Amino acid sequence: MSNLENARCEACHADAPQVSDEELKELMREIPDWTPVTNDNVMMLQREFKFKNFKQALAFTNRVGDLAEEEKHHPELVTEWGKVTVTWWTHAINGLHKNDFIMAAKTDSVVDA
């Protein structure tokens, strides 16, 4: 269990700082299965999860949705047969905040729940 998994998201506003390059490297060590991606000049965290069927993929999607509601921080979720792609970023700052890394770690924790 990572330190990030046990952390709580903080309220984030438009003037909150994005993670620095140094913070990005450090935080990525705690979520090595995630990939930083850039979409429309916005850095995001993304991971694809594989499942045996649609039912398992949908159940995982719902677990991630429950986490998102608990923390009041919501991802992009693409649910397909046997696969869910989860993308985290902070809309208010158009980039990555520590909250995104916390939620990525929490997402990892519910894969086999």
UniProtKB/Swiss-Prot annotation:
The keyword Oxidoreductase does not apply. Its EC number is 4.2.1.96. SUPFAM superfamilies: PCD-like. The keyword ATP-binding does not apply. GO terms for biological process: tetrahydrobiopterin biosynthetic process. One of its GO terms (molecular function) is 4-alpha-hydroxytetrahydrobiopterin dehydratase activity. Keywords: Lyase. It holds the Pfam family Pterin_4a. It catalyses: (4aS,6R)-4a-hydroxy-L-erythro-5,6,7,8-tetrahydrobiopterin = (6R)-L-erythro-6,7-dihydrobiopterin + H2O. NCBIfam families: PRK00823.1-1. Belongs to the pterin-4-alpha-carbinolamine dehydratase family. This is Putative pterin-4-alpha-carbinolamine dehydratase.
